[in-house]
């Protein structure tokens, strides 16, 4: 009886603490939202009480503005997706106000830059290389040139700073949060670019890539505003990409060339199309789909074709099957009606019985995508639930193949719905109950029911390629858990074990 009473009191103690904890969490979230919207969306609150009707309606309006910019469901409330965006590391330049449009650029093409100080996180040579490559990202698509100087005033003054710094009207907030900021072309602070020294700067993707953040900030220093295109380098939130890959989207290129124009055109000898090799260790795919008892892997103008029960691999031109389809497809999947849908940009084609159906291509927006979605990165249909997942940037949509409508509650962030696979997906398909997600030269075998990765492999393991010694990627993926939210699960498990231990100890005490 005593042990039961103690257990009851313990339960009441934990239960009574929850409302207070929830209230405190709500207050912290509201303070976070106010600071975020004030910094990036020009929110001006009168007084300190957000519950006032005037301030409340103003806050709701700014939340809606922010949700619309990031492509979230516009509710005006601080839902979990909105808070998650607000907590994501990002650029310190506002999303609205004077930065709402592309700004006038420099009135010259030959610009100078100077690195005022260096971060101790990286070797000086690595910092120099990251800055140089970040500037080259923009010079490769414009007539701009960049020359490094070692003294005097440069057009772009580069510095690593912390918190409140010098004459700069912007400040840093310590680790995470704001990573950097830059000022548009002009006199004084114009072109100046600052990075938060409290961050962990790296030359790869282990911490925050200086190359990627610098390339983004230099976009501002050249006159670009933020983009709501989630694939764009000028998207305000930090997205980890392979630094060896070219980071500009067409949206970035169009923006910078609208200010400075494109590269001068010079006649060049045309090069033949590159033919992909199945056993290339860095092989990536544009799209993958089941097609009855086959799987097709698309790359450029070509496709590989394998059968579920045959080890042979066929390599063909896409045009040899479907002359009307374009090259460089971006997504594909087989629906429950044995139709294949293939996607490129804002269009999709439907294939039945190996023939492209008439009246195609059609717009992806008839499937229920909002107008800001310009392309699909990957798609896969769960044949058990008849639900299709579409991957767009860092988000996934779910489509009901029976009602032919998008499911409510979507889009959701990929890292929350499919923990462990990372931020983006290049291609996907289903095989023997597992999803296979492809990102770069890796593929993730994913248990749908357990919501966990079972294996990580190279992309071309389907092609019977001989693995070089020590090349297996089938390992314990602790780093992938950083994306998965499994830390939260482990926390709850630990809390449960702690409570169980306390109760067990109290029972032993009462028995004496």
Curated annotation (Swiss-Prot):
Binds 4 Ca(2+) ions per subunit. Binds 2 Zn(2+) ions per subunit. Residues 1-17 form the signal peptide. Ca(2+) 3 binds at residues 173-174, 178, 196, 199. GO terms for molecular function: metalloendopeptidase activity; zinc ion binding. Its main location: endoplasmic reticulum. Residues 18-98 form a propeptide. Disulfide bonds join 279-465. A motif (Cysteine switch) lies at residues 89-96. Ca(2+) 1 binds at residues 121, 199. Keywords: Calcium, Collagen degradation, Disulfide bond, Endoplasmic reticulum, Glycoprotein, Hydrolase, Metal-binding, Metalloprotease, Protease, Repeat, Signal, Zinc, Zymogen. One of its GO terms (biological process) is extracellular matrix organization. N-glycosylated. Its cofactor is Ca(2+); Zn(2+). Hemopexin repeats lie at residues 276-325, 326-371, 373-421, 422-465. Glycans are attached at residue 110. InterPro entries: Hemopexin-like_dom, Hemopexin-like_dom_sf, Hemopexin-like_repeat, Hemopexin_CS, M10A_MMP, MetalloPept_cat_dom_sf, Pept_M10_metallopeptidase, Pept_M10A. Zn(2+) 1 binds at residues 165, 181, 194. It is an enzyme of class 3 (hydrolase). Residues 466-512 are annotated as: Required for retention in the endoplasmic reticulum. Ca(2+) 2 binds at residues 155, 188, 192. Its EC number is 3.4.24.-. SUPFAM superfamilies: Hemopexin-like domain (SSF50923), Metalloproteases ('zincins'), catalytic domain (SSF55486), PGBD-like (SSF47090). Matrix metalloproteinases degrade protein components of the extracellular matrix such as fibronectin, laminin, gelatins and/or collagens. The conserved cysteine present in the cysteine-switch motif binds the catalytic zinc ion, thus inhibiting the enzyme. The dissociation of the cysteine from the zinc ion upon the activation-peptide release activates the enzyme. This is Matrix metalloproteinase-27.
